Amino acid sequence: MESGTVLLESKSSPLNLLHEMHELRLLGHLCDVTVIVDYQGVREDFMAHKAVLAATSKFFKEVFLNEKRADGTRTNVYLSEVQVVDFASFLEFVYTARVRVKEDRVQQMLEVAEKLKCLDLSETCLQLKKQMLESVLLELQNFSESQEVEASSGPQVSVTPSSKASVPAGEDAHSNGLVDSSDYPIERLGNGLSPETPSKKCKEKLDKKKDVAKPPFPKIRRASGRLAGKKVFVEIPKKKYTRRLREQQKSAEEAAKNDKCPQDQSPDNERVEAEPASKSEACPASVEREESLQKVEGEKEEEEGKDGEEKKKSNFQCTVCDKAFLYEKSFLKHIKYHHGVATEVVYRCDTCGQTFANRCNLKSHQRHVHSSERHFPCEMCAKKFKRKKDVKRHVLQVHEGGGERHRCGQCGKGLSSKTALRLHERTHTGDKPYGCTKCDAKFSQPSALKTHLRVHTGERPFVCDECGARFTQNHMLIYHKRCHTGERPFMCETCGKSFASKEYLKHHNRIHTGSKPFKCEVCLRTFAQRNSLYQHIKVHTGERPYCCDQCGKQFTQVNALQRHHRIHTGEKPYMCNACGRTFTDKSTLRRHTSIHDKNTPWKSFLVIVDGSPKNDEGQKTEQPDEEYASPKLSDRLLSFGENSHFNNLLEVQGNVPAVQENSSTDTACKAVVSQDALLTTSISALGELTPQTVSMPAHLPSLTNME
């Protein structure tokens, strides 16, 4: 028996698929295209998936199918004709099939959909506009009917041959926003016909003329009666709407001329203004709307003429709607609320590059910080300041005893405010109320906790423009930049040495003062720097966190591990420029330089060799300068005083083991040097080289004094 087939269909799968793709885009996962939207200086990058964009937009589909790129590289698509806010809404619609926008932006979204060829979004916008238009037309129809009912139930207008239609006392004809009914087209009556009884044919033609002149979508701003004070807006593009009304108005005027009744051709010169009593109920709506439209269009033409004059005087002009503005603030507000372009104005100081929230703060900064003018003097001591608040602070702290009012009771330090004093007192009490939620660290200030949290999050917001190095704190970036500029603004007054940071100078001054404020609680040994104390404490605790991956030896400091690694690799990056010998660390080189000259600073002998290779063949490390040649043994001896005793030195064939300059328990690594290095290796080797009849100079052991 054959089994039938069944259909497995999930109604929620499409929605779930869209939801998951939307989540992936928000997290930036699996995105293979970056859409860069740059519109009138406002730029933003959007990450997305090619498959989703190509499936919903024919524009992106054509771009992706025609592109030629290398595998593994992300595609960049540049859009300059779409606003950032509109493309963000477009992306949300593509990934969620729905987006919420303001009513006045529906037309913009329709234009974006047409540019990007997104049929789904285009159909959605058109359907929504149709619904909006139908609702507005229905409201206008109800409004028109209510106006006709009110007009029919209102008082009758008396007609006189010599004047226009009168208005009831105390009521302004234009107070309700409608055009006066006296402007209604007049009828010329003759052949003995009285004004009160016009011919039936003329009345019929008059009705036709009114019907033709009545626009289908009248634009009425305000209404009288029950709806007075309410505004009715029709969401139709202005240019198309006004053009359509003008065409209908012209056609209505032509029809009115062609359909004039025979009585209009009468030679009778008597002109009578009349309004048939039988038509008094049907006249108000259509004719008044036509008159109101003519009035509105006349006002628009006057406004356009005024706008043309203002544009000549204006400094800022909108490229979207050609509206001109005299001030930048008004222009920015216009493009933000009417076109959705949220421009980010950056107020940056040209001198120091600092940015500010508004123009006022920038002007204040330029006026007070970069200006040497001091217009605000102190009345007590005549000292001048740049700002008034600086004078107030000066008077408060200096003349009114502000320093004594905020002075620490334990150390006597004066603080500028109570808040600063309270924070300072925590250094004495040890109070640390701000604790980290991810570790046991505690801090006395919230700013210190915020900086500490970057250790857990990995955030390094401060980036160096030169090398791309990132830092957790701004002052660390400032110190780092001085490595590139070579700036050392902090100089020691004792020895004249300069430093890049104030902290380094503070540590250096302890060399001259002999201050060692950090004491070990175990052995009572004192140190000049806190970091040195931390390293020393590991001696008591036995902690050796740094382990060699080749021999397993452990160290308390990372730089000690780095020096130890050079024993395995044979790297000797530090060379003595007097004898050409190389060393694994600077401390050994410093001790070695005392052989040559104790009075000369050891750094004058230092030469750093980049990428020093391992010396497998017993030759010295390669010199950094190709023209530099290692001097011969006899030449090197003659370079020192009283070395004439060694003129008869014998050359020794072969190589001898050299003394290790680094004390280490690892005896597996041996270094082999040539006979040119015998002089500075061991005293015993020199004893073999020297003839027995010649006595060794007394100063020679100092030349070969090693570690």
Curated annotation (Swiss-Prot):
Name of the protein in its database record: GDNF-inducible zinc finger protein 1
Keyword flag Acetylation: no
UniProt xrefs under InterPro entries: BTB/POZ_dom, SKP1/BTB/POZ_sf, Znf_C2H2_sf, Znf_C2H2_type
Keywords on record: Cytoplasm, DNA-binding, Metal-binding, Nucleus, Phosphoprotein, Repeat, Repressor, Transcription, Transcription regulation, Zinc, Zinc-finger
GO cellular component: cytoplasm; nucleolus; nucleoplasm; nucleus
KW S-adenosyl-L-methionine (keyword) present: no
Any GO BP annotation: branching involved in ureteric bud morphogenesis
One GO MF term attached to the UniProt entry: zinc ion binding
Function comment: Transcriptional repressor that binds the GZF1 responsive element (GRE) (consensus: 5'-TGCGCN[TG][CA]TATA-3'). May be regulating VSX2/HOX10 expression.
Family assignment from sequence similarity: Belongs to the krueppel C2H2-type zinc-finger protein family.
Basic and acidic residues bias (residue ranges): 198-213, 243-278, 287-298
Positions of region (Disordered): 149-221, 243-309
Zinc finger (C2H2-type): 316-338, 347-370, 376-399, 406-428, 434-456, 462-484, 490-512, 518-540, 546-568, 574-596
Residues carrying Phosphoserine: S612
UniProt organism field: Rattus norvegicus (Rat)
Compartment list: Cytoplasm; Nucleus, Nucleoplasm; Nucleus, Nucleolus
SUPFAM superfamilies for the chain: beta-beta-alpha zinc fingers, POZ domain
Domain annotation BTB: ranges: 31-103
